[in-house]
A protein has these predicted regions:
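A structural boundary/capping signal
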Residues: 1-157
Length: 157
């Protein structure tokens, strides 16, 4: 198993356990995990991968049939695709057989469905106070949410 697959699987398991225990009730969007959590999840996964010296960028793509719907996943410097929330589309946009709960490797059907107007964006740094962007060098609302969620899942990693 690759380092990317090990870390992605470990994070997905931690998120599933925390969600199953109701620990995300007050942390939108994680209260609906994996639905609507792709971008925040990528921030956390990007942080964990960076801890292992694996640099990633987020790929943010629009749905080919409705550009108001978007999905986000990671791509490493070597071009490896990592997506641990594509199962949110199972039974709706994708057949169950086309979904991997932890995708590490090539693009799958989910990424192909969200291929319109793709944008590369950096991961949000939430774990380094030198990177806080709100007034008085405090974490911005997104960074605060990521800090809160990471504290919840850290015990399951």
């Amino acid at each position: 198993m690759t380092v990317e697959k090990r870390i992605a699987t470990k994070l997905r398991c931690a998120l599933d356990v925390a969600h199953g225990k109701g620990e995300f009730v007050k942390y939108w969007p994680f209260s609906r995990f994996p639905y609507d959590c792709c971008e925040h999840t990528c921030d956390i996964l990007g942080y964990l991968l960076l801890e292992e010296n694996i640099n990633t960028i987020q790929i943010n793509g629009a749905y080919i049939k409705d550009p108001t719907r978007r999905h986000v996943w990671l791509k490493t410097e070597k071009g490896v695709i990592i997506d641990i929330t594509e199962d949110q589309f199972a039974g709706e946009l994708l057949d169950e057989k086309d979904v991997e709960i932890v995708r590490v490797g090539m693009e799958g059907q989910a990424q192909k469905l969200f291929s319109k107007n793709r944008v590369e964006q950096p991961n949000t740094v939430f774990n380094d106070s030198r990177e806080y962007t709100d007034f008085g060098n405090c974490p911005n609302p997104r960074q605060k949410r990521l800090i809160e969620v990471f504290k919840v899942i850290e015990k399951y990693l």
